From Swiss-Prot:
Molecular function via GO: nucleic acid binding; rRNA (adenine-N6,N6-)-dimethyltransferase activity; tRNA (adenine-N6)-methyltransferase activity
Name recorded for this polypeptide: tRNA1(Val) (adenine(37)-N6)-methyltransferase
Phylogenetic lineage: Bacteria, Pseudomonadati, Pseudomonadota, Gammaproteobacteria, Alteromonadales
InterPro entries named among the record's database cross-references: DNA_methylase_N6_adenine_CS, rRNA_Ade_Mease_Trfase_CS, SAM-dependent_MTases_sf, Small_mtfrase_dom, tRNA_Adenine-N(6)_MTase, tRNA_adenine-N6_MeTrfase
Family: Belongs to the methyltransferase superfamily. tRNA (adenine-N(6)-)-methyltransferase family.
Organism expressing this protein natively: Shewanella woodyi (strain ATCC 51908 / MS32)
Enzyme Commission number(s) of this protein: 2.1.1.223
SUPFAM superfamilies: S-adenosyl-L-methionine-dependent methyltransferases (SSF53335)
Amino acid sequence: MAFTFKQFHIDDHGCGMPVSTDGVLLGAWAPLSKAENLLDIGAGSGLLSLMAAQRSEAQITAVELDDTAFHACNKNFIASKWQSRLNLVYASVQEFCNQHTDGNNAQFDHIICNPPYFKGGTQSSNRLRAQARHTDSLTFHALLEVITKLLAATGTASLILPSQSMTPFIEEVEKSELWMNQLTNISDSRFKAPHRHLFTLKHKATKLAEDDTVITNNLCIKEPDASYTPEMIALITGFYLKY
């Protein structure tokens, strides 16, 4: 399916994880204003990289393992006005991490990722969708190891996960060299419990220089009449044609 945003176009045909509200929320919410060297883990169609290119002046490296998604992402990058700042790498993030840390390559001051989150259970019959959604392809432990190695000392990683994945993810974070310093709980309406969570991670060493209190707030997506809330509109106004 094709999606036209205000400043770029996405064709996600054949991608395991198509354009979604989750991706748009993460791309619009992540604190990217000071990003100079950004990594997109599991780029898919390139949505997060293109949103980051619109919101910052960063040089962006996108890593994608799936062949179909890689080619779709490449086409979307070439069609954008930020092609000169977008670098697409065909590899698993573990392979990329090993290659990148083997030399004198700079670490990334921002990492963005909409990670796979289903663990066990019945996988989709669509191989690409299963790979994009299930942690068999990238466990939380492996993801946090990669972020720890690739994130600059004062850098920030931005992610999104559903509620059912937060407890096992936080357990892994607590065993890692990272800590969660910002959390936004997302609900569909003011009368429903949060179902998604946007959050940032930083190196634990930064807790010596910062207040280690987690900055927590809430975001409600829709009003009772199903229209978007002012808070949601404020996030997406730079991207959705209607707003």
